[in-house]
Amino acid sequence: MERLKDNIYYCVSSLPYWRTPWGNQINGTDGSWFPPLINKDLQSERLYLFSTDICRSLYAKFERHSSVLNIPTESFSIPAEVFLNSTLNPDNIAFGTADSGVLDVSVCRQGAPIYISLPHLLYAADQ
């Protein structure tokens, strides 16, 4: 099971982009598979993903049980706190000072002014 936590991203185990060692960690899978037997009944259970598009790890939380063609499924979603600014979520201090709902990824995109958000600026600040 520990093998599922091993990560390789261009042969490195951490990133050089973010402000803290925690922010530079590579945690989780690419999102196409996860460890079996996830405890979906705990609110604190987090499913960690690493996204090469945003150059960081993030997590999803269990949302609900459902089914597709009578096959049981579970839905997970990225919670709002993942993209809150560091004033509202101090855990995000590593990822800069952009407004809530967006992530400035220019540090890992050769300085190009690129900001990432959830679809349709979900959870973004009003301004």
Indicate residue ranges for each PLM-predicted region.
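Extracellular or lumenal secretory-pathway regions
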Residues: 1-72, 78-127
